[in-house]
């Protein structure tokens, strides 16, 4: 046990040098960026007896490969993490049945191509007890649209106006066909900024304290139904799969989300619980189209043809070869056929002017260098990277590999060759969000700097088209165009393994890691 605790401390130190700076004000816990999660004095008094009995219940402890770095709801991907941690909610949410529902919106309708109206329920509350009405939704969603450019991908800049306390007017810059899907996008969470600049949210849990990228300590939100039946939750970050397994074996964590294939097998062999799900995520490579050897389309084609994706599936012990940009259980998933042709790949490199010499290709006196880059919070990608490096060496590449934190920062900098990346590409059940994010010209997450009039036109048509069958056809065409132009490299449609204790044997993860901590976790 002592050895394990030492391992855990070391793991945490490696993950981050961030420290918790917590303060108390009127018995309301806050973090260093002033995220407030509050209860009134009366509520505390009313729950005194319940709290006494609940104090005897051990917290649910979850081990993950990542933990949020901050709690600013308008900061890049932070809102996604807050929802995954059970602190925030998007306006609409995807259920286990794949259907969208909302605790905040009663109904909505399209007024004209760029205008919608929505009627709010005004029954859900923030964690401080304030009602979520039309004005509250307008305030937070407008703030997101102004401060987080990732929220502008699907419909351009969107403005929200509260006509009264139950009526919301929504105006979009580009046409939008599925308002509920748009409001399910992970950027669009419900929050309120208080006069002291702190935030309150609406999820089933509130933040008691946290250490950036290391640990989140959560308590049930008293203003969320069923709070008295929920235990406290602690989320711990592990970068090392062995340390996470040690923690799980020792009974120190109730859930390991996710575990590598090897660890999953060892846990199963010990007759312990492992849940396997279709991740919904896609594993793919991001090419740098602006500089380096990958500017040459023939070099990108050679990589696409020269790698053996089946070897990735074998090493990951599950998943499928990708057929496009979406998980294959979606009706708009691509129909791209990926195959290996090593001889054709070598011929393309020959045509590009790279001549093999001493097992490395050379052109104009320079070797064919490529650096593969990935990040530690998705261990599967490291496995793929190691295999891919060997495959590319066989083609004559001089390959370097690196694992970095802050992968999006590296991607935005443009200082990379080929990034191995993971993304849930349809968390809303619609293809428009991710296709616009990654492939529309000049979008924030278009890390490749891909520009295609044909793609932009397809995405414009997708925004205007109401017919479901035609929308599916447009999404498939967009994925075929990606396979042709190769701004990214389709790799794997993965499965994930999650280890759970007997206490959580009934827990069923879904939709990737978007709702790890949810209202059913007890």
Name these PLM-found stretches.
Residues 355-425, 496:
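Ligand/substrate-recognition segments at binding pockets and active sites
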Residues 78, 176-228, 232, 242-243, ...:
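Gly/Pro-rich hinge or "lid" segments in bacterial periplasmic/extracellular proteins
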Residues 63-111, 200, 512-514:
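N-terminal lobe/hinge region of extracytoplasmic solute-binding protein
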Residues 106-148:
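Aromatic- and charge-enriched surface segment that lines or borders ligand/interaction sites
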Residues 306-332, 380-387, 410-522:
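Detector for C-terminal structural segments
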Residues 321-357, 376-382:
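Structural transition elements
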Residues 221-266, 398:
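Ligand-site clamp/hinge motif
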Residues 109, 113, 150-193:
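Surface-exposed binding/hinge segments that line
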